[in-house]
Amino acid sequence: MIAMEGGAGNISTKMALEDTILTPRFYTTDFAAMDRLNVDLVRREWDAVMAELRADHNRKHFVRTPEFEKDLNELPEALRLEFKDFLVSSLTAEFSGCVLYAEIKKRITNPDIRELFSYMSRDEARHAGFINEILKDHGIGVDLGFLTKVKKYTYFKPKFIFYATYLSEKIGYARYITIYRQMERHPERQFHPIFKWFERWCNDEFRHGEAFALLMRADPKLLSGLNKLWIKFFLLAVFATMHVRDHMRPAFYEALGMPVDEYDMRVFRITSEISRQVFPVMLDIDNPRFWAGLNQLRKVSEAIADAKAQGGVMGAIKRAVLPLKAALTFGRLYMLPAKSNELPREIRLQPAW
């Protein structure tokens, strides 16, 4: 452990408070609609998922060991900064889920749904707390109480919460398990002990995603008609955001020994394969135009960052024009043909990747 750095904790909190298209957000929703949810259509599989959550297999997993005391300042500067960004972003995403799930639990009486969100908020609080303790060990902890009070909240209808959080949980599983498997193959690249925790950690994310899959399959209209267009939108938004964000951490992925595009493709494949359990449409991630569009979005995002740094009149003009270019690029990506998927009779999956 190292001494607290003056103001460092505030810097981490400011990072977590950032509201951009690339940063994790806090959400609120229609709690009355949540209270009316009915899972009778998937009762057998629902009870099985709830039994797993009730068992709390990871209740003793998130305990730091002495190896966590290694000074982050021993890392090369670029890697240290990007790893810190990775931790703060991960913490914000986990804590966002914790806040939303806890609020849903507090505001509803439906016993099935209330029990689910009780367990999921428990898990997300545990994840966020574990990351924050690591940050605090190095004098850069995030003030979670302050974050709860001042972070902007975005309202989503329940169906949008389901689409977004299902993808967030499943892509979180895919990201963590991909890094964990890489560390299994190349232990010499494990520059921080947190990666050893990722296998069991990501199983929590997987179980949460299973619950959201069942909530959607319990209401077939969420997966038909015009809602297919919304599903395609959320798939593209989540994949595109991840791709752009990952390219902002080149030193991090170099240290892991995984080129960003290779890592992203692996995560996209796992997430797409898993989402066949619930989504009737899939993105064609093997279409060369899909990757060309993602790379164009990345370049526009980099140009926007450069324009902000440039300042002045020209910088302001670029900041006004470039988001339009990003929107057009996203629109072209959205218009690419998607793949149809026939939903399986059995919904539940096991984390076998």
From Swiss-Prot:
Keyword NADP recorded: yes
GO molecular function list: iron ion binding; magnesium-protoporphyrin IX monomethyl ester (oxidative) cyclase activity
Entry's EC annotation: 1.14.13.81
Keyword entries, A-Z: Bacteriochlorophyll biosynthesis, Chlorophyll biosynthesis, Iron, Metal-binding, NADP, Oxidoreductase, Photosynthesis
Domain of life: Bacteria
InterPro entries in the record: AcsF, Ferritin-like_SF, Rr_diiron-bd_dom
Family per record: Belongs to the AcsF family.
Protein's UniProt name: Aerobic magnesium-protoporphyrin IX monomethyl ester [oxidative] cyclase
Source organism: Bradyrhizobium sp. (strain BTAi1 / ATCC BAA-1182)
Top-level taxonomy: Bacteria, Pseudomonadati, Pseudomonadota, Alphaproteobacteria, Hyphomicrobiales
Gene behind the chain: acsF
